[in-house]
Structures are given as structure tokens and as C-alpha cells.
Curated annotation (Swiss-Prot):
Presequence extent in this chain: 1-26
UniProt entry tagged with the keyword Metal-binding: no
GN (gene name): PPR336
GO molecular function, one term: nucleotide binding
Major subcellular site: mitochondrion
Domain of life of the source: Eukaryota
Naturally occurring in which organism (per UniProt): Arabidopsis thaliana (Mouse-ear cress)
Name of the protein described by the UniProt record: Small ribosomal subunit protein mS86 (rPPR1)
Alphabetical keyword list: Membrane, Mitochondrion, Mitochondrion inner membrane, Nucleotide-binding, Repeat, Ribonucleoprotein, Ribosomal protein, RNA-binding, Transit peptide
């Protein structure tokens, strides 16, 4: 699951890096990554600079140049995100040959990247670029690259199928590849397959995966059962959720906060936030301590059902109980409050968020500014624009246009 969280976290990290004065001061690829610079950057500074550039660079040759100059490596989290940004950028513009040049070129020409770890990362990145056939090719050609093939690359290939949402191919890989290459599936392999069945609307098939795991002496963990719970909720099979919870108890698997969070999120996705709130009350009655994730799911759920008062109430309760809202919680609530016309509360939360150096996206901020102006709070709107321009110098012209359109 770690690879998925890395990819999903890239958008949030981009936002924080763009707000950094250090990154804003870096002007171009030639000065950022030049080896002849009088003040050479550290490896970490190069990675941050590369990530900032890769977001917006349009020339495929320049994207490859930036990646090579930064000497990116999968050992570093920010480098993994930079790789993902480069591939995503190239794929969006349909520069698929450039994606191959980047990933295959690194495996073939960088001795430090001739490893199963980078190959596994490349397998997933190809799927991210909608090039699953290349993911399969890399897996098959590992010997050609003089890279050993273990369960790690098998799991990466299954994850690539999940990224591509090619569930039929995932099932084929699971059935054929372990036998073909003499690979013994592990816990992660089985959890990947549970996710495949649950995402493809066949959550009941996950029972057979659990049975196979146990036949081979591998114990399902809370993640295994959590995936099943999420899958059954998505299919509106609450009775099956009860069965899974009973299985957890029978096997001594703790039903902790993470399991409750999965249940709460699943119910909120199905617009059953009141039912999810009842689970929160049950947690508190049982002496369990909900965390930031618990409240964030509920806040998002009630916002999505246009119950903004309950969402605001939960936000206050969350803070009062010592749970610190993260940036996404702020952004979600600000977005929905603007949508619901509560610009005063949205402004207050926006100021809190910006004090923590968390600035919502341009579209959210523009919605808030225009809403304040409609509420005859033009000065507050202009003040907010001024603060945002300090954080995002690259958007100054856009904000000047927004400000010029405000009532005078």
C-alpha cells in the first residue's frame, strides 16, 4: 500500500513546495541543476528544485534533462514523487516514447538504479502513464537488465494492474506468474488480490483469498480485513461487513481505530454520514480515541451531504479533543463552505490554514475571494489576495486579474 500513498501524496507535497520561499527563488533548470554553479546545491535541494520544475515543464526533452541532472533515486521519497511527476507530465501530453526513454534509460544506463527496487517503481510508473504493457515487459525482462526477480516485483506488477484498473490482467498475473517464475506469494500479494476483487465489485471472492492464505500459513492482517470491509460497503452488503468483523475477532485481529476509520469513510462515501457518526459515538463509548483521520472523513461526509453545520461542529470537537486538522481537512471544509455560501467561516479557516503555511488551491481561493466580494466584503477579499500573492508569486498575474474584476 506504500506505493499508492506515495503517488496520492504527490499533489499535497507539490502545494507545500510551491509555497516555499527557497523553491520560489530557484529560477530555471540551467541554474538550478547546473554542475558548474558556484554554489552547488545539495542532493535534497536538487530534488526539490527538480520536483518544482517537473510540475510545469512542457518540453519532453527538458523533462528528461531535469531528471538526469537531478540524479534522482528511488531511495529518497521526494525523488520518487519527482519521478511520478515527470511520468505524469509526459503521459498527459502523450509523450509515451519519452516515458520509455526515461525509465528504461535509467535502468540500462545508471548502475545505481539497476536494482529490483527501481524496476518495481518503474513497473508502477508505467501503469501510471497508462502503459501497462510496458509494466509487463519490464517484469518479463528483469534478467535482461541483470536484476533478480522476487515477490517484490510481482507485487509491484499487481499494484500496476490496480493503478491501471485492469482487474482481468491482475487475476491472470496472480494465477500464472508465481508458477512461471517460481515466486511464492506473500501477505502483500494476497492483500493486493483482495483489493483487486473488492475494487472490481467481487468482494465475496476475497473469502477464497483468505482461505488460500491460511492454507499456506499466512495470517491475514487488519489491512486484509479492512480491504474486505471497504469492498462490501461499496457493494452495500452490510451483513457481510458483520461477518468480516466476526472473522477478525475469531482470529485475534484487533478491531482498532484504523478499522473504524475504514467503516466511517465507507459509509460517508455512500452518503450515510449519520450512520458513520453513530460509529464515532460507539468508539467514544468503548473508550477508543478517534484521530484526525476519523474526524476528517466525517467532516468530508457531512459536507458532501450539504450538512455544513454538523461539519463545522465536528471540526470544533476535533480541535477541542486535541486532534490537529491537516491541510486537506482545512481545504475540504473551506471548499464546501464556499460552495454553501458561508464565506465568513471559510475566511476564518483560510486564515488559520495560511498561518500554518497551508494555502488552498487557486480555484478554492478564487471562489472564496469572489464570495467575499458578493457579501460586500471587498476589503477582506483584497487583503486575502495580497496574502496569497506573497505565498504564490507565480500566480501574481492571475490574482491581479481577479482583483481588477472586484467591485471598486
Amino acid at each position: 500500500m506504500a506505493l499508492l500513498s506515495r503517488i496520492r501524496s504527490s499533489t499535497s507535497l507539490f502545494r507545500h513546495l510551491n509555497a516555499s520561499p527557497q523553491i520560489r527563488s530557484l529560477s530555471s533548470a540551467s541554474t538550478i541543476l547546473s554542475p558548474d554553479s558556484k554554489t552547488p546545491l545539495t542532493s535534497k535541494e536538487k530534488s526539490k528544485a527538480a520536483l518544482s520544475l517537473l510540475k510545469s515543464e512542457k518540453d519532453p526533452d527538458r523533462i528528461l534533462e531535469i531528471c538526469r541532472a537531478a540524479s534522482l533515486t528511488p531511495d529518497c521519497r521526494i525523488d520518487r514523487i519527482a519521478f511520478s511527476a515527470a511520468v505524469e507530465n509526459l503521459a498527459e501530453k502523450k509523450h509515451f516514447s519519452a516515458v520509455s526513454n526515461l525509465l528504461d534509460g535509467f535502468i540500462e544506463n545508471r548502475p545505481d538504479l539497476k536494482s529490483e527496487r527501481f524496476a518495481a517503481h518503474a513497473i508502477v510508473l508505467y501503469a501510471q502513464a497508462n502503459m501497462l504493457d510496458h509494466s509487463l515487459r519490464v517484469f518479463r525482462d528483469l534478467e535482461k537488465f541483470e536484476i533478480s526477480r522476487t515477490v517484490k516485483s510481482l507485487n509491484a506488477l499487481l499494484f500496476a494492474c490496480l493503478v491501471a484498473k485492469d482487474y482481468k490482467e491482475a487475476k491472470r498475473v496472480y494465477i500464472e506468474m508465481p508458477k512461471m517464475y517460481g515466486i511464492e506469494p506473500d501477505l502483500e500479494t494476497y492483500n493486493r488480490m483482495i483489493k483487486v476483487f473488492c475494487e472490481s465489485g467481487s468482494a465475496s471472492s476475497s473469502y477464497s483469498i483468505v482461505a488460500e492464505m491460511e492454507r499456506k500459513g499466512i495470517k491475514p492482517n487488519s489491512s486484509s480485513f479492512g480491504l474486505m470491509i471497504s469492498g462490501f460497503y461499496a457493494e452495500d452488503k452490510s451483513d457481510e461487513v458483520g461477518k468480516v468483523l466476526a472473522m477478525m475477532k475469531d482470529r485475534g485481529v484487533n478491531i482498532g481505530v484504523s478499522t473504524y476509520n475504514i467503516r466511517i469513510q465507507s459509509l460517508c462515501k455512500r452518503k450515510k454520514s449519520k450512520e458513520a457518526k453513530a460509529l464515532l459515538d460507539g468508539m467514544l463509548s468503548a473508550g477508543m480515541k478517534p484521530n484526525t483521520v476519523t474526524y476528517s472523513h466525517l467532516i468530508h461526509g457531512f459536507c458532501n451531504e450539504d450538512d455544513f453545520e454538523e461539519a463545522k461542529k465536528l471540526f470544533k470537537i476535533m480541535v477541542n479533543r486535541g486532534c490537529k486538522p491537516d491541510s486537506e481537512c482545512y481545504f475540504t471544509l473551506i471548499y464546501y463552505l464556499c460552495k454553501g455560501g458561508d464565506f465568513e467561516t471559510a475566511l476564518s479557516l483560510c486564515k488559520e490554514s495560511m498561518e500554518k503555511n497551508w494555502v488552498p488551491s487557486f480555484s478554492i481561493m478564487k471562489s472564496l475571494v469572489n464570495g467575499l466580494a458578493k457579501d460586500s466584503k471587498v476589503e477582506e477579499a483584497k487583503e486575502l489576495i495580497g496574502q496569497v500573492k506573497e505565498k504564490f508569486t507565480r500566480n501574481v498575474e492571475l490574482w491581479n486579474e481577479v482583483e481588477a474584476a472586484l467591485p471598486q
